[in-house]
């Protein structure tokens, strides 16, 4: 209209009057906030998690209801800048409260939820959340993989899921190349309880460490970048990596009651845990899959990396060194208030499997042929009949190894127990740039088993 008016010759000038949403860039008054490039990067704008815009634009009405579990070596319980939940747990002894107040866990907790704008210390990503300390070590010494057992880690995740945690942060890894079924079963259980499980990618500078590398598909695996926007040299990478967050020179709380500067993917993961908390603090009814998709779909594509299409990655362009990119708190929370994506429907009603043919109703007809032996090996084949050729289907599973993609997914499994074994199998569907997911809890029931 403005162009038409100007070109008519009747007006000296014509310009549209734009409606602009103003946004404050006011930063919190915490003592060391100016050092927190991860929240506001003055030297390299855009290489941060866009915290200030998120903080100033949204109210987070449910923030005080969100519990974030820190599975670690304990959290110092008398730090002025931390708000701890009134339940903690020692997964090694089974004790409540934990009784361990480790330095590593205290540092992780500060990144997630240190109180913002209180005139002291630092600001956490999700100020106002309750931190649930869960210790998995024998002592509160610096966290080490030799200091616990896989059972302790699995019990820690289950405890968090059973006691109100919505987010479970795991800044630890194991020195093994094989998936750990005991921990994966606990993660699957937590997903079923409505929890997002976040893992650091590891600090070896090579492939993502276990158990993150072999974790169920709803897990978020986080690598680290520095203040220049480059992947940190120690950060784990590869096909299991989902996103990156700041992980070098991060200011946070420590076990002395003071503050310190740290580096590692251990401190990248809690940025994502904090943003997940902010999403649920805006809309606590969102599903695990919706929240995970929001995190991945709203990232910043930081420079120096070539992103491409991966048939197993349905939330946009992806890169093996930085995943979908740098997490973006403002964009993620903005996506909550927008309309939910409209994608192909796929629904399941399957919860338990007996020998024979089973079905999932949704796009066309999904037929599951299940065969297995008690205390032996078997094979599950998932296929879609009468499929829509304009739709991309991707199968994933907690059952190793992953094989195949598209319309048919086959996976081998083995069982050495007389008890039912629970697994997750998921079908992700992409059409017109939109994706949705549906999964089932697959219970492999040994022949002859009686309830």
What are these regions (language model features)?
Residues 1-31, 59, 64, 186:
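Inhibitory N-terminal propeptides of secreted protease zymogens
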Residues 11, 28-175, 220, 228, ...:
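Active-site core segment of subtilase-fold serine proteases
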Residues 109-112, 132-138, 166-170, 233, ...:
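Hydrolase catalytic cores
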Residues 374-385:
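A short beta-strand segment in extracellular, disulfide-stabilized domains
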């Amino acid at each position: 209209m403005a162009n038409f008016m100007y070109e008519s010759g009747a007006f000296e000038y014509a310009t549209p009057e734009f409606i602009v949403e103003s946004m404050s860039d006011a930063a919190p008054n915490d003592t060391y906030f100016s050092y927190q490039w991860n929240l506001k990067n003055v030297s390299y704008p855009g290489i941060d998690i866009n915290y200030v815009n998120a903080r100033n634009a949204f109210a987070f009405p449910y923030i005080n209801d969100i519990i974030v579990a820190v599975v670690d070596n304990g959290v110092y319980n008398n730090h002025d800048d931390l708000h701890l939940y009134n339940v903690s747990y020692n997964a090694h002894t089974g004790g409540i409260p934990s009784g361990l107040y480790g330095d590593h866990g205290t540092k992780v907790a500060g990144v997630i939820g240190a109180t913002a704008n209180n005139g002291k210390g630092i600001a956490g990503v999700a100020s106002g959340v309750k931190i649930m300390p869960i210790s998995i070590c024998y002592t509160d010494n610096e966290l080490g993989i030799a200091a616990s057992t896989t059972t302790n880690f699995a019990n820690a995740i289950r405890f968090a899921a059973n006691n109100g945690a919505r987010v479970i942060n795991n800044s630890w890894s194991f020195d093994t190349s094989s998936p750990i079924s005991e921990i994966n079963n606990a993660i699957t259980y937590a997903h079923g309880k409505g929890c997002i499980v976040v893992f650091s990618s590891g600090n070896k500078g090579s492939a993502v460490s276990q158990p993150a590398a072999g974790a169920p598909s709803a897990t978020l695996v986080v690598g680290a970048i520095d203040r220049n926007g480059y992947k940190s040299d120690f950060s784990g990478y590869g096909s299991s990596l989902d996103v990156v967050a700041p992980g070098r020179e991060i200011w946070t709380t420590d076990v002395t009651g003071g503050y310190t500067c740290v580096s590692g993917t251990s401190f990248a993961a809690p940025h994502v845990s904090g943003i997940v908390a902010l999403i649920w603090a805006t809309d606590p009814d969102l599903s695990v899959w919706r929240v995970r998709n929001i995190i991945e779909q709203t990232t910043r594509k930081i420079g120096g990396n070539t992103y491409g299409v991966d048939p197993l990655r349905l939330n946009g362009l992806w890169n093996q060194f930085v995943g979908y990119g740098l997490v973006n708190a403002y964009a993620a929370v903005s996506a909550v208030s927008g309309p939910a994506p409209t994608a192909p429907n796929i629904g399941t009603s399957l919860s338990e499997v007996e020998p024979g043919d089973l079905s999932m109703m949704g796009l066309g007809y999904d037929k599951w042929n299940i065969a297995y032996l008690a205390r032996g090996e078997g094979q599950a084949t998932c296929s879609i009949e009468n499929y829509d050729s304009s739709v991309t289907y991707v199968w994933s599973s907690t059952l190793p190894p992953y094989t195949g993609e598209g319309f048919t997914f086959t996976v081998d499994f083995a069982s050495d127990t007389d008890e039912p074994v629970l697994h997750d199998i998921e079908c992700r569907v992409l059409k017109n740039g939109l994706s949705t997911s549906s999964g089932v809890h697959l219970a492999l029931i040994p022949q002859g088993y009686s309830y």
